[in-house]
Amino acid sequence: MNMNGNYYPAKPSTEDKRILLVEDDPNFGTVLKDYLVMSGFDVTLAKNGMEGFELFKKEIFDMCILDVMMPYKDGFTLAREIREKNEKIPIIFLTARTMREDVIKGYKSGGDDYLNKPFDSEILLMKIRSMLQRKNI
């Protein structure tokens, strides 16, 4: 309730939002996971595309953040497989691949957004919150 006595709906909480983070660089993956956890998310880190897809099939996630260049299964392939199981889950690619063709391939494989490394962590956080808020409308 504000000072005028009006009620506002509660802002959506991120505390119960689960993110699948698939990143093969262990240092970067851990730093990003810790940042997202400190920002209020429940984050599961997978070290490659195969592990990421196995986790996706077993658990329920609200969003996926995928690297593109990974061993065993690249992020584009993983995104297509995720889309076959869930058409609506938000997918963000977070990658060093900056070529126009890669960005287009990312969107065509099911990505909702494509961020290049290095990136601004605050912008990533705003994109995540915005996508999750729209998903819950």
Model regions: which residues?
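Conserved acidic carboxylate
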Residues: 23
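Two-component/phosphorelay signaling modules centered on CheY-like receiver
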Residues: 26-44
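Acidic, metal-coordinating helix/loop segments flanking the phosphotransfer/catalytic sites
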Residues: 45-63
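Active-site residues of response regulator receiver
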Residues: 67, 95
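The feature encodes the CheY-like receiver
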Residues: 71, 99, 117
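C-terminal output helix
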Residues: 119-128, 132
